[in-house]
């Protein structure tokens, strides 16, 4: 696992302060780190978010994307019966996890495998924003 220190980029990145603020705000959300998640760089233009959602059925999960905000919600069905635990180490609470997406990041799909929710993202750069070669006369 790699951890990246982005602080040196603050000095040399002009106009990207909003991006860094989004990253910091995402880390400081008041949800206590539940559920835990990973963000993986698959390749230059593809990302994958993996969220640990053990105990949630596919029908109890909701994923929405609007503008640059990805929201993942998990809500257990109301029909769960009361249980008496001697020890409860597995969290069964409902959750809402928000991810601020950078511009041109699109959600391509999601699947639930062995208690992990995978959300695939792709960076799509419009033709107008791609670098173009300028001829010198």
From Swiss-Prot:
Cellular component per GO, a single term: cytoplasm
Keyword Flavoprotein: no
Induction: By heat shock.
Entry keywords, A to Z: Chaperone, Cytoplasm, Stress response
Subcellular location(s) per record: Cytoplasm
Any GO BP annotation: response to heat
Top-level taxon: Bacteria
GO molecular function, one term: mRNA 5'-UTR binding
SUPFAM superfamilies: HSP20-like chaperones
Residue ranges of domain sHSP in the record: 28-137
Record has Isomerase as a keyword: no
Family in the record: Belongs to the small heat shock protein (HSP20) family.
Function: Associates with aggregated proteins, together with IbpB, to stabilize and protect them from irreversible denaturation and extensive proteolysis during heat shock and oxidative stress. Aggregated proteins bound to the IbpAB complex are more efficiently refolded and reactivated by the ATP-dependent chaperone systems ClpB and DnaK/DnaJ/GrpE. Its activity is ATP-independent.
The protein's assembly and partners: Monomer. Forms homomultimers of about 100-150 subunits at optimal growth temperatures. Conformation changes to monomers at high temperatures or high ionic concentrations.
UniProt name for this protein: Small heat shock protein IbpA
Species this chain originates from: Escherichia coli (strain K12)
